[in-house]
């Protein structure tokens, strides 16, 4: 019995890979995830760890993707809401095509276990995360152990 579903996916053609859509079709059934009796996910949290090939400035109204990354995740956000879940800002690594040369992979990789540990240890500030558009290794809302 867990409270958080964390999906780790790349952004493919402005969406998630088809295997995730298949998982949604098989698991998120009426009577389980939504609809009459479909309360098994109610109150749980959905978060994505996502990679995008383009740099962060590409995902702006003036960038070549024309929209923020979060806009491409709206179907997942709405799915979470339909299932009674809370949708958190994604943990994102932009510019994966240049990230290794730019030295951005190591901090992101180090931030990921910090994120997981904070979730496990109940130190992750979900309220703050739900208000943000995107989370990065340098902007994780992690509190002190309490």
Where are the predicted features?
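Glycine-rich phosphate/pyrophosphate-binding loop and the adjoining helix
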Residues: 79-146
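Helix-loop-strand module that forms the ligand-binding subsite of alpha/beta enzymes
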Residues: 1-77
């Amino acid at each position: 019995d867990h409270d958080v579903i964390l999906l780790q996916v790349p952004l493919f053609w402005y969406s998630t890979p088809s295997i995730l859509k298949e998982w949604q079709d098989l698991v998120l059934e009426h009577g389980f995830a939504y609809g009459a009796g479909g309360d098994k996910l109610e109150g749980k949290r959905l978060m994505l760890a996502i990679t995008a090939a383009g740099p962060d400035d590409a995902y702006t109204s003036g960038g070549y993707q024309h929209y923020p990354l979060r806009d491409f995740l709206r179907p997942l956000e709405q799915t979470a809401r339909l299932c009674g879940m809370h949708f958190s800002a994604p943990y994102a690594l932009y510019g994966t095509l240049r990230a290794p040369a730019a030295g951005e992979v190591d901090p992101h990789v180090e931030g990921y276990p910090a994120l997981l540990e904070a979730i496990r240890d109940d130190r992750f500030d979900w309220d703050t995360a739900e208000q943000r558009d995107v989370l990065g290794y340098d902007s994780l809302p992690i509190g002190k152990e309490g």
